[in-house]
């Protein structure tokens, strides 16, 4: 990846517009999880310390474009930023015609999705955003897979468009895991359906040494080996694809599973061999023998990419597989990267965040990167960097 980095630029007295991912949970006007806000602070401080005029922008939720509802306002985020930065962070509601501010100060622009044309990458809106800054900084990996006005269009027209530290760090970590991995390389892909992760599975099967499948996805692979999966979620029409993937790549399939009769936090869990699943069983987790097999694979791995739990870990009786796997990844000497909402929830639940080499902030963007797709917001930064090289 060849892009301009924020750290390479002189920011003194410059109008710096930073696209961040401040889409955080809010209850009764108060931020309930400020992880993303805290992650954004080093970039903000870098610009402030150089005497820049700092304008932050982000989306929050899915409001109706053109309808600035208080329910989707970024005011609670501005309040929390003010506390964390120990300075007043003003929320700018009308910012598209420019913001009056002094050097070394920061404002938060109101929800970008209040602007008509944001989601469809409207050209005129993109130009208006670009006109209020000297430097545009893309620092929201979680939205890098979306070609929208505040992620893509503004980067086309801003005088300078660069990558922020968060985005650069994310891309470096993913590149290290996928482009030049230490072997053996192992990927874990969980989720409810093969169909939703098919492109990821096919892409990873070409580069990994072992591919671990979990969750509902694993049921289709168990069925592909001729075993009964009872009433479990299973895509029987994709069994030929599962068989093809198993021919192309080493995919360890569970020899034992944990079943229940209903999807419930009070359902009784029963461990049994995969070959003994009854017609009225539902598979909700891998069994302890299979979990131990996966743990051994993780401990010997050189690179681990983790996207998705291997069971219904939200229910404690079906959480053993994901817990064993997660702790084995944490204990491994491998370079490990974890991404996806359910995966991060598991990382939090088992307290292993500081033992994973890199935690990806992106959901959809993380998946698309694993699929081998170009991320539009990164692609446009590469194009802008190329223009600078040609002019030099």
Curated annotation (Swiss-Prot):
It catalyses: (2R)-3-phosphoglycerate + ATP = (2R)-3-phospho-glyceroyl phosphate + ADP. GO terms for molecular function: ADP binding; ATP binding; phosphoglycerate kinase activity. Keywords: ATP-binding, Cytoplasm, Glycolysis, Kinase, Nucleotide-binding, Transferase. Substrate binds at residues 21-23, 36, 59-62, 113, 146. InterPro entries: Phosphoglycerate_kinase (IPR001576), Phosphoglycerate_kinase_CS (IPR015911), Phosphoglycerate_kinase_N (IPR015824), Phosphoglycerate_kinase_sf (IPR036043). Pathway: Carbohydrate degradation; glycolysis; pyruvate from D-glyceraldehyde 3-phosphate: step 2/5. The keyword ATP-binding applies. Gene3D superfamilies: Phosphoglycerate kinase, N-terminal domain. GO terms for cellular component: cytosol. GO terms for biological process: gluconeogenesis; glycolytic process. Pfam families: PGK. Monomer. Belongs to the phosphoglycerate kinase family. This is Phosphoglycerate kinase. It comes from Vesicomyosocius okutanii subsp. Calyptogena okutanii (strain HA).
């Amino acid at each position: 990846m060849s892009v301009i980095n924020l750290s390479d630029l002189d920011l003194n007295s410059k109008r710096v517009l930073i696209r961040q991912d401040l889409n955080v949970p809010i209850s009764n006007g108060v931020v309930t999880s400020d992880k993303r806000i805290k992650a954004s602070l080093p970039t903000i401080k870098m610009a402030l310390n150089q005497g820049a005029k700092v304008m932050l922008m982000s989306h929050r939720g899915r409001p109706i474009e053109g309808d600035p509802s208080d329910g989707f306002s970024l005011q609670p985020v501005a309040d929390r930023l003010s506390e964390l930065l120990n300075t007043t962070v003003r929320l700018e509601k009308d910012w598209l015609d420019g913001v009056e501010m002094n050097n070394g100060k920061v404002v938060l622009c109101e929800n970008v999705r209040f602007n008509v044309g944001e989601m469809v990458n409207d050209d005129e809106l993109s130009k208006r955003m670009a006109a209020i800054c000297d430097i545009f900084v893309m620092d929201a990996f979680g939205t890098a897979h979306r070609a929208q006005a505040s992620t893509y269009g503004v980067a086309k027209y801003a005088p300078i468009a660069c990558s922020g530290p968060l985005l650069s760090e994310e891309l470096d970590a993913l590149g290290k895991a996928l482009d030049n991995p230490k072997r053996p390389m192992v990927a874990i892909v969980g989720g409810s359906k093969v169909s939703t992760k098919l492109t990821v599975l096919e892409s990873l099967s070409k580069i990994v040494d072992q591919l671990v499948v979990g969750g509902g996805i694993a049921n289709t692979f168990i069925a592909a080996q001729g075993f009964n999966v009872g009433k479990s979620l299973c895509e029987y029409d994709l069994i030929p694809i599962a068989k093809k993937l198993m021919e192309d790549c080493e995919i360890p399939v569970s020899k034992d599973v944990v079943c229940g009769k209903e999807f419930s936090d009070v359902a009784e869990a029963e461990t049994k061999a995969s070959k003994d699943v009854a017609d009225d069983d539902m598979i909700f987790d891998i069994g302890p023998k299979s979990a131990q097999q996966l743990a051994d694979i993780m401990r010997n791995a050189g690179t681990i990419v983790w996207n998705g739990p291997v069971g219904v870990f939200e229910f404690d009786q079906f959480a053993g597989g994901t817990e064993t796997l997660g702790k084995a990844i944490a204990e491994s000497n491998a370079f490990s990267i974890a991404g996806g909402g359910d995966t991060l929830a598991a990382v939090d639940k088992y307290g292993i965040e500081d033992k994973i080499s890199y935690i990806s902030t992106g959901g959809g963007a993380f998946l698309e990167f694993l699929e081998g797709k170009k991320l539009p917001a990164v692609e446009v930064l590469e194009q802008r960097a190329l223009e600078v090289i040609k002019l030099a």
